[in-house]
Amino acid sequence: MRIISIVVLVITVSVLALTQGKTRDANQKTRVARETTSMRKQAKATFTLKSWDEKNYDEIGGTPKLTRVSATKSYKGDIDGEGNLEYLMMYRTAGSASFIGLERVTGSVGGRSGSFVLQHSGTFEGGVAKVTLSVVPGSGIGDLRGMSGEGGFEAGHQPPYAMTLDYGFE
C-alpha cells in the first residue's frame, strides 16, 4: 500500500510540475503577444513608379481583358528603398479594373534593414487606384524578419503617392 501511495504522489507531483510549466509557457506567450501588439507602429511613406510594363496575356473579343504588369517603385519616408511588383489585372470596362499583386520591398522600415513581401489587392475606378496591402507572413529577411502588417493607399495620376503601413514584429 505504501508503494502505491508513493507512486501516486510521484505522479501527482509530476503532473503539477508539467501543468505549472505549461501555464508559465502560456503566460510567457501571452505577454510576448501583448508586447508585440502594443509595439506596432505606423510607417508613412511616398512612392513613385520608376517603370510600368503592362502586357495582355488573355483577351477574347467581348470579354474582360487580362494583363500582367511588371513595375518598379522607389520609396521615401519611414519606408525607404525599392519595390519590385508584379500585378495581374482584369479590365472590367475601359478605365475600370481589379488587380492583385506581390511586391518585394528591399530597403529599410523604421530604421531596420532587409526586405519583405507585400500582397496587393485593389481596384481602379475613375482614375483612382484603391489598394489594400498586407505583409506576407514569413517573407521578412534581415532585420525585417518576423514582420507583419497591413496598410494601403489611394493613388491618382499625381506622383508621389502617399501610403501607410501599420506594422510590428513577432
Describe each PLM feature range.
Residues 1-4:
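Positively charged n-region of N-terminal signal peptides that target proteins for export
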Residues 7-15:
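Bacterial N-terminal signal peptides
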Residues 13, 20-22, 53:
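Generic low-complexity, intrinsically disordered sequence content enriched
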Residues 17-29:
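Signal peptide processing junction and immediate N-terminal pro/mature segment
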Residues 27-170:
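Beta-strand-enriched cores of mature, soluble protein domains
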